[in-house]
């Protein structure tokens, strides 16, 4: 190989690699965004990759990464002086927090907030001038907000149950909140009653160095029969430790366990909901609950018709488990928010039917144009090609009126029946390919007694497989990604295909970027997998179609 050829190939491969990287960036961004939690999405500094979860062995704790990066001058002195201002506000620091380390982080947090709120002209002055301008802004409320950003505390609030008749009851309301659940692992966790902004809750001080889990249990009397129990809710504040909260329920002599854990991600108050299987699971409503699966009869289980036993278990996560929880969290949320598999079934049905009808109708019509002799063939072929010149927007309203008059509105019929009549473009592609097939094969088959349909089925179709594969791929992508058709013809959410279902999902979650990207990735993967495995047929089909005729 000559030096010129080496340089030529090097440049060619470099351009191909660069192009691949450039075109892969949007997909990489979608994939990384799909596994981010909300605070990463709305952070003031953009970061392509998700932040690594940090499992904690003890809690409560300080998150020293929240204000790890600061911008602005005088970073060596001002954070400590802001910490002194925080002390001067009289903010009540919890006794179980390290005061020195906490105020140090709060000083950094106040510095960051002042850097973003004060005019930049002030920051060109001395440290004393900056401190003087910032002092009126350092209030107890401001300090409290900064403290909430760096302090992580696992807390349990009230537990509520609801019956099928919508009777709501707070469990253990006659007891202090820290005594409503019995501590089964005192060597791991200590329960303390605390209050914050008028809300009473149980603070969990834990240490997983001896055991990797803690367990809290409680037996409660219900105001209704346990058979009517619909859902259980726990108001809690996670501590961003990425641990796993599991629930098991005993009632009516049976034990029920959660099918998956509630992940202790983020650090704002949230509601964890568990519910037994029921009609809601197959409905189109947003599923904000975790299913409780029936484990069958259990020895010693509560059997009183108006009594229930709850067992909450918090399990410490390793770094690998925490990463798995983070990678799957948003995807579980997507599957909970929409009837994803119902949408997938509809899309798969449409894909299979449309591909089958398109391949059959287009190949049969192309065969008649390419191999059969009949009066007006060329005129009909030109007329068919002329239909490609008509913009689809022109025929959109007439199509809608026709389908509505036929009673097919709000059914799947308009989304697949039209494919039984072929596609002008695909017919043209197949005709060009068929015209390149030697007529000797057809003549030999006729001598053997084959009619035109048998020739079509046994001779022509096997020879045009690459082109059929290309058409199948195009049809798959068009049907899988079809948005306009369902938008026009479908009103019943139960009939939504995946593309339109994800649009409705994006509206429901107010275009939350992480959830939207997770849903989009789930929709994109089948197309990518199909093209990856079928690219040889796709390239072969398009190439041969282009050179035949």
Spell out what each predicted region is.
Residues 1-5, 38-336:
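Membrane-topology segments of multi-pass transport proteins
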Residues 2-97, 103-105, 109, 117-121, ...:
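A structural signal for multi-pass alpha-helical bundles of membrane permease subunits
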């Amino acid at each position: 190989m000559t030096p010129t050829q080496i340089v030529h190939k090097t440049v060619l491969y470099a351009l191909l690699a660069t192009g691949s990287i450039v075109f892969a960036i949007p997909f990489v961004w979608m994939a990384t965004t799909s596994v981010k939690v909300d605070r990463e999405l709305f952070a003031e500094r953009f970061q392509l990759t998700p932040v690594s979860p940090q499992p904690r062995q003890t809690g409560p704790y300080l998150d020293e990464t929240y204000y790890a990066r600061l911008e602005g001058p005088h970073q060596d002195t001002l954070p400590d002086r802001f910490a002194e201002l925080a002390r001067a506000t009289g903010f009540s620091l919890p006794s179980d927090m390290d005061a020195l380390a906490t105020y140090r982080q709060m000083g950094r947090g106040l510095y960051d907030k002042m850097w973003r709120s004060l005019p930049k002209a002030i920051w060109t002055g001395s440290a004393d001038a900056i401190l003087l301008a910032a002092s009126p802004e350092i209030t107890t409320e401001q300090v409290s907000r900064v403290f909430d950003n760096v302090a992580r505390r696992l807390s349990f609030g009230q537990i509520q149950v609801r019956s099928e008749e919508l009777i709501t009851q707070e469990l253990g309301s006659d007891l202090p909140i820290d005594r409503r659940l019995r501590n089964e692992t005192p060597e791991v966790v200590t329960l303390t009653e605390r209050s914050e902004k008028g809300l009473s809750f149980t603070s969990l001080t834990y240490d997983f160095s001896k055991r990797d889990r803690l367990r809290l249990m409680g037996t409660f009397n219900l105001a209704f029969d346990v058979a009517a129990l619909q859902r259980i809710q726990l108001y809690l504040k996670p501590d961003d430790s990425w641990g796993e909260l599991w629930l098991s329920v005993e009632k009516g002599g049976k034990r029920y366990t959660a099918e998956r854990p509630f992940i202790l991600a983020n650090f704002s108050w949230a509601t964890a909901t568990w519910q037994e299987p029921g009609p809601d699971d197959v409905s189109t409503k947003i599923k904000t609950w975790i299913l409780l699966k029936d484990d069958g009869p259990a020895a010693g289980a509560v059997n009183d018709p108006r009594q229930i036993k709850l067992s909450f278990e918090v399990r410490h996560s390793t770094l690998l488990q925490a990463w798995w929880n983070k990678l799957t969290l948003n995807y579980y949320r997507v599957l909970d928010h929409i009837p994803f598999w119902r949408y997938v079934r509809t899309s798969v049905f449409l894909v299979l039917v449309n591909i089958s009808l398109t391949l059959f109708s287009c190949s049969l019509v192309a065969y008649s144009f390419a191999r059969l002799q009949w009066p007006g063939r060329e005129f009909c072929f030109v007329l068919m090609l002329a239909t490609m010149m008509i913009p689809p927007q022109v025929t959109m309203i007439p199509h809608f009126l026709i389908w509505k008059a036929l009673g097919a509105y709000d059914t799947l019929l308009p989304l697949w029946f039209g494919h039984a009549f072929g596609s002008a473009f695909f017919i043209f592609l197949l005709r060009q390919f068929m015209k390149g097939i030697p007529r000797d094969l057809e003549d030999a088959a006729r001598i053997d007694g084959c009619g035109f349909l048998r020739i079509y089925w046994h001779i022509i179709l096997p020879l045009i497989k690459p082109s059929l594969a290309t058409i199948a791929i195009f049809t798959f992508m068009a049907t899988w990604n079809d948005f306009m058709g369902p938008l026009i013809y479908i009103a019943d959410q139960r009939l939504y295909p995946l593309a339109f279902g994800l649009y409705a999902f994006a509206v429901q979650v107010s275009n939350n970027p992480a959830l939207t990207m997770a849903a989009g990735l789930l929709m994109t993967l089948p197309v990518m997998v199909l093209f990856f495995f079928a690219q040889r047929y796709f390239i072969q089909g398009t190439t041969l179609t282009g050179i035949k005729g």
